[in-house]
């Protein structure tokens, strides 16, 4: 994960949990889990926002969530299998220099917000994109036939 401690702080400067709470309402709770290698101090924490960075098993958090907001995390590959909405907050996409395995804009399994304003608009409206998510799951998982070791041994002769 390329983000430094300083860059993680910048992410949280752009992720306004209070504004998101206003948009979603009191029936929603925000669980924030930063990359564990780069924890961020002073994450918002109150009755509607919890820092889950130290929580060991992210898959538990997937199961209790109704929506996943992330940037470039590979976690979307697992989360997409749950068939729940995914929102991608890629405010620095133009500067992101690690590259992707596929076309991020067209292949990722959710709507992409490039700015805070876009993030808030997607949250206010229906940010779900079922066809995009279904295509992503098909792309990621349909070619898994099992027996990878056997196929490698066959290739090696």
Located regions from the model:
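PLP-dependent class I/II
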Residues: 26-29, 67, 134
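Catalytic binding pocket for nucleotide-activated donors in carbohydrate/polymer assembly enzymes
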Residues: 44-47, 74-141
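Donor nucleotide-activated moiety binding/catalytic core segment of transferases
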Residues: 31-77, 82
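Conserved catalytic-core segment of nucleotide-activated headgroup transferases in glycan assembly
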Residues: 1-42, 113, 149
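C-terminal alpha-helical cap of glycosyltransferases
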Residues: 145-157
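A generic local structural motif
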Residues: 15-19, 53-57, 74, 98-99
